[in-house]
Amino acid sequence: MAVLYGAAAANAFNVSPPVKSSPGEHGGNIRSLTDTVTYATQTTSDTIVIGGGLLPVGARVLEVIMTTSVTTGSATLALGITGTVAKYKAAGAVTTANVPQVFGLAAALNVPLTAPEQLFLTIAGASLPASGTLVVTVLYVVD
């Protein structure tokens, strides 16, 4: 039976000399950017800026967690930045109420940011519900 390694494990255990893991791979302090959105029939093509600050240079996003109090129905949400509106979450409905759902596009995860990022949600498909809340949490490391 073969012994296989993920990229970080290969660097740490299967090369000589070992390569130091990044904070996103081992030992990093996880930080969060969290915001709450109150639904009020926000319409398609609207954007909702989230977070009390920017993701800093060097941050490595690990995952995005969304929890909604009501289903978004036909409304879809994407999470991204200017120029890449679906960088962290492709447009999709959040259809299970009160159950945290984890998102993250693999190409954008554990990649150090070269510039600060302001995150926003983009609405498509239909308007958001008339009432309820959405909590968005972005977990990242920067050390």
Regions from the language model: what does each represent?
Residues 2-143:
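Surface-exposed, low-hydrophobicity beta-strand/loop segments enriched in small/polar/acidic residues
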